């Protein structure tokens, strides 16, 4: 990709990334902030749509402010992106922001041989924070290049406490001993159990969101990644 093509992707993505959004602070955020103080590459993995990109935004607001470069590899404009293009990204990001201290790469597994480029960024003293939907795949590939120099963080969908924060439901220590409040908490727990903790689904309530997550996991993370030829039989197996 040319430098101009990269600029047309990097600039708007970073503008969106740095826009403040009213989101639920994830309970893992304090732990992640401590890990960010280490020299290790951080790998945030977890279910698709569990909120990994939002967690990146939260840690950026907490620690880095305007010292970051962000790139999401699920952008259709990056379909032709290859590992060789990381050099252009490196040069472009310094051209746009010479105060860069950290790079955030979202869904990095979409680029083959990405781990080679990450070694260079890390070697040049930049903090590197990655997300991906396949924990074992990311750890295995990065481990071949940065043995002992990366840390894995798994992000799960909302916990019950995070769900209550999303619903703006305040809970006091003794609420379980007050019948009316205890009944309300039981109802909230039942709703959380039945709906799950996917932030996007909770926000919009559309069943299509959950169905699309299922399809993405099935196709992108399993069938394509592992070269499964008999898709029909695999789908039947997945429905069991």
Where are these regions (language model features)?
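Interdomain hinge/linker elements that couple catalytic modules in large macromolecular machines
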Residues: 2-17, 22, 161, 165-240
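Hydrophobic anchor at the beta1->P-loop junction of P-loop NTPases
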Residues: 44
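Short glycine-rich substrate-engagement loop in P-loop NTPases that contacts/grips substrate
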Residues: 69-101
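Pre-Walker A adenine-sensing motif
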Residues: 19-36
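Short regulatory helix/loop adjacent to the ATP-binding pocket of P-loop NTPases
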Residues: 136-152, 166-168
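Conserved lysine of the Walker
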Residues: 52
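Structural recognition of the conserved hydrophobic beta-strand(s) that form the central parallel beta-sheet
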Residues: 127-133, 154
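Hydrophobic positions on the alpha1 helix immediately C-terminal to the Walker A/P-loop
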Residues: 55, 59
